[in-house]
Amino acid sequence: IPKNAEGKLPAIAVSGPFGAVKEQCSGLYAQTMAERGFITIAFDPSFTGESTGEPRRTASPDINTEDFLAAVDYLSMRDDVDAGRIAIIGICGWGGIALNAAAQDPRIKATAAITMYDMSRVSGNGYFDADDSEESRYSARKAWAEARSADLKNGTFTMAGGVVDPLPENAPRFVKDYYAYYKTPRGYHKRSGNSNDGWRTTGCQAYANTRFLYYINEIRSAVLIVHGEKAHSRYFGESAFRYMMDGKAEGYDFARKPNPVPVNKQLLIIPGASHCDLYDGGGKGMIPWDNIEEFLKKNLKR
């Protein structure tokens, strides 16, 4: 809550990255935006962190979307929140989830998707769509089915592992960036799956068999997608933005109508920034706080 707050204020719900906890990036975003005049909440998604749900470290497109909607429910019922001025911020995989939530709930008046992933696309197609084939998906489905059967037989859940540790010398640049955040004092947290043993082996299976951004071309409320120029994930944000605006884009196997309200949509590329630079600024002040604040205040006006 902002210091010296009076009356009903605009509010923001924040979550992400995918596999992180609120004490990491989302807490930073929530704190910073509170300092800029918003009531904010950063939350752990269901099955992770300090939130409840079994089995632990399980992800679900519908439940994760509902997590955002539940946060909006909570904010809308607070006496100090103007229920007509609620926004959401999603980071990394939660950027895509935020777009899905915005497509579903008109109470969300503005959405910022920061360094976003489309988790349904990467889970089903692999990075850079390298595994976008029936054969690759069938192989993955067989492996998941075998893992589920083994877990049931053994009565325990195997874990997929968080960020690789030790870090191979030949690891891709973005994996090294993940390591530099999640596995060092810069961003490590004991409850973070990414910092420790990751998701349950079959925990993200549901994302691989769905395409949950189908209706984002119908989002009427304001949307800001922010990506780093050098981010490996940049293609997720650019494709989602094009599809949201035009109803068609590379990586989306469906074509729909253009957005009915295109004037309040924005794609912002940060020069020189990597994916993880937008987690905490990367020590170089890469997060465009002023742009995010301006976007939210403009679109949360009464």
Where are these regions (language model features)?
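Short beta-strand/loop motif that positions the catalytic acidic residue
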Residues: 219, 225-227
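The serine-hydrolase catalytic nucleophile loop
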Residues: 19-31, 45, 237
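Alpha/beta-hydrolase active-site loop
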Residues: 58-79, 290
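Short beta-strand element of the alpha/beta-hydrolase
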Residues: 7-17
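Conserved alpha/beta-hydrolase
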Residues: 32-52
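Alpha/beta-hydrolase-fold enzymes
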Residues: 99-184
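Alpha/beta-hydrolase fold nucleophile elbow
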Residues: 79-92
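Catalytic histidine-centered segment of alpha/beta-hydrolase-like enzymes
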Residues: 273-286
